[in-house]
Amino acid sequence: MESKLQIISGKYRGRKLALPPSARPTQNRARIALFNMLESGIIENTDKMVVWDAFAGSDAFGIECISRYNATAIFTDVAPESIATIRKNIAAISAENNAKIVQADAIGVIQQFARGANLVFVDAPYDTAEIGRAFVNKLGRTADSGTILVWEQESNNAVEPNTDTWEVLRDKTYGRAHFLILQKI
């Protein structure tokens, strides 16, 4: 079956992305809405942006940022098949110089990647909401002030962030996907 997931804007617009077998990628329409929100005053300086796609899976968020912005993306995932797919997708667009790919548990490498990342995307497995919460809480203790966090959750299983650490900029639901866009206080 051919992937319907594609890069939606920027220099690689229209390119299809390979998917790992177990992926649950954010649908194109939801990603379009997400980037419209980000580009409506949340992200202002995209020059030399560092993006961390923490539970990368299909890598669609990080690759979209590479395509749209002058960005370097860090991709982390524990699944070997996801890492192999990320490498394949990055090679297909010849973006190796804009990508760092690490097979690791995202929570375990927060100290390594949180500082310096301007934009962090977390889309932990939908059936494990507590993993997403644990990541966001630990990231809140480490990330630089002003860091933007996009937290995707299952809409019927969404949990709230710690508002002592994060300011809620947007809170939107698109089908099963619930997006919280947060800024580190």
Regions found by a protein language model. Give the residues of each.
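Conserved SAM/SAH-binding beta-strand->alpha-helix loop
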Residues: 79-81
